[in-house]
Every structure is written in C-alpha cells, then in structure tokens.
Curated annotation (Swiss-Prot):
The modification Phosphoserine is found at S138. InterPro entries: P-loop_NTPase, Sulfotransferase_dom. The keyword Electron transport does not apply. This is Sulfotransferase 1A1. Substrate binds at K106, T107, H108. The lineage of its organism: Eukaryota, Metazoa, Chordata, Craniata, Vertebrata. It comes from Canis lupus familiaris (Dog).
C-alpha cells in the first residue's frame, strides 16, 4: 500500500462560521453535486455520541440480522461518511457512488452545512444525542488519537474550546437543539445515547418501527448482542483498527474507549464541573431537551 501523506494535525478551517477538520471542509464543495435518494437513511450525530453504534445497529437491521453480511467491510464503507475526506483514502462521496440502494449515510454536519437535497427529499434521519459532559471527555481522547484534528492541548483548555464551540463541527449545544427543532417538521427519530445504554432492545424496536421493518424477537436479541460495546470493541469491521495509524493512532487512545455513561466524573474537576454547569444552563435554557449525565 502506498504511503499515506503526513496528516500532521492541520488547524481547523471555518465554513459559514463553523470550524471543521481541514480535509472535511475541503470536501464540502463537492457535496453540492450530491443527490439524495428518497430511500436513503441519514444517521446524524454530533461526534462521539454513538454514531458507530447506531450505524452497526442499522446495518444489522438492513441485513436482517446476518452477522456475516455485516462483516463484509469496515463500517465506514458499509455506512459511508458523507463529508469524509483524508489523504490516501476514498472520500465519503466516492464510497457512496458504489453503495447500492437503500443507502445508510452518516454525517456530523450541522444543518447550516447539510446538503439541501437531504431535506428536499424528506430523507428519514436517525439522530443520536449524548450528554455534553461525556461527549466532551470522549471528544478530547478522540482528538488525541485522530491526527486529522489539531493538537487538543490540555484537558482544561480543550474543555474551554468545547464550551465555546471552537472544536470540529462547532457547538454541541447548537447541534443537539437544531436537530431537535427539525424533528418537529421532518422525519427525524431523535434518540438519546443514555436510553440506548439503559435498554438497547427498546431503542432498537423504536428504530425498526421508524424504518418500517419488522424482525423476529430472536433476531432483535442477536442485534443487541452483536452491537454491545464489548462485541464492537473487538470487531475490526466496527472499531476503526483497519485505518492507518497515520489517521487514527489506537496506541494513544482506542477509538472504542469505554462506551459508558457518567465517565465524565473521572475527568472533570469540581471547579470545571461548576463552570460547565453554569454555562450549560445559559445555553440550554428553554430548549425543551433534557439529558441524563449518569445512569
């Protein structure tokens, strides 16, 4: 395999006021030509909110619970990542061109950057939201290991950037709120990571109903088992270990790190938590969303 060019932690690039990984920002121009199909299904999340988990669940549903079919390729090929671009790897759009319908498509884009065709075609969306504290901790470790991001510096300085929306994909607060608003006018199934952790079978049943499919109970149980954190952490078709360490260095931090709710307590100091809570209350006031920060 040819050597992948040095990714060397380029600075974020702003598009319409939203910071993005440099390569992803460059990919947005070609997204203008993207045509959604009515039977596409979009998986949308802010980063580190259970994207790969729900992608694996949906691929299992689309493959009628056939585990072997779900090992046909890495998850980023089975569920193309719309805005993805990185040196030496096919772009998300290139992968999509070879993906047969009905397609599962992943994005982290805020609505301001989402191709209008997805809304025009009334494409169904499964959105997963996770509490901000766990997202911030997970994102910090992801920044450390995924070298397409700038250097995260210290946890304290990263947390400040997260609160200010100065991380890739911008503000968590805006992301979860605007997709919540969209769910009132567009076919969006809005799920919570914490609910999925608490009762995955119940949430998978919600997804099945939303996509208009039914599966035998034993198949649903198999999906619960196959998409458990332990199984996915050991599944090379789901855990991103097939990517070059030039892109993701698992020796720094695993892509599948802990997969729990409430891990923020091991990282936040009392002072950070107080500062975060005060800022959070201002940004989330009156939005109608409430998150559990532990189970």
């Amino acid at each position: 395999m040819e050597d992948i060019p040095d990714t060397s932690r380029p600075p974020l690039k702003y598009v319409k006021g939203i910071p993005l990984i440099k390569y992803f920002a460059e990919a947005l121009e070609s997204l203008q030509d993207f045509q959604a199909q009515p039977d596409d299904l979009l998986i949308s999340t802010y980063p580190k909110s259970g994207t790969t988990w729900v992608s694996e669940i949906l691929d299992m549903i689309y493959q009628d619970g056939d585990v072997e079919k779900c090992r046909r390729a890495p998850v980023f090929i089975r569920v193309p990542f719309l805005e993805f671009k990185a040196p030496g790897i096919p772009t998300g759009l290139e992968v999509l061109k070879d993906t047969p319908a009905p397609r599962l498509i992943k994005t982290h884009l805020p609505l301001a950057l989402l191709p209008q065709t997805l809304l025009d075609q009334k494409v169904k969306v499964v959105y997963v939201a996770r509490n901000a504290k766990d997202v911030a901790v997970s994102y910090y470790h992801f920044y450390r290991m995924a070298k397409v991001h700038p250097d995260p510096d210290t946890w304290d300085s990263f947390l400040e950037k997260f609160m200010a929306g100065e991380v890739s994909y911008g503000s968590w607060y805006q992301h979860v709120q605007e997709w919540w608003e969209l769910s009132h006018t567009h076919p969006v199934l809005y799920l919570f990571y914490e609910d999925m952790k608490e009762n995955p079978k119940r949430e998978i049943q919600k997804i099945l109903k939303f996509v208009g499919r039914s599966l035998p109970e034993e198949t649903v149980d198999l999906i619960v088992q196959h998409t458990s954190f332990k199984e996915m952490k050991n599944n090379s078709m789901a855990n991103y270990t097939t990517l070059s360490p030039d892109i993701m260095d698992h020796s720094i931090s695993a892509f599948m790190r802990k997969g729990i709710s409430g891990d923020w307590k091991t990282t936040f100091t009392v002072a950070q938590n107080e500062r975060f809570d005060a800022d959070y209350a201002k940004k989330m006031e009156g939005c109608g969303l409430s998150f559990r920060t532990q189970l």
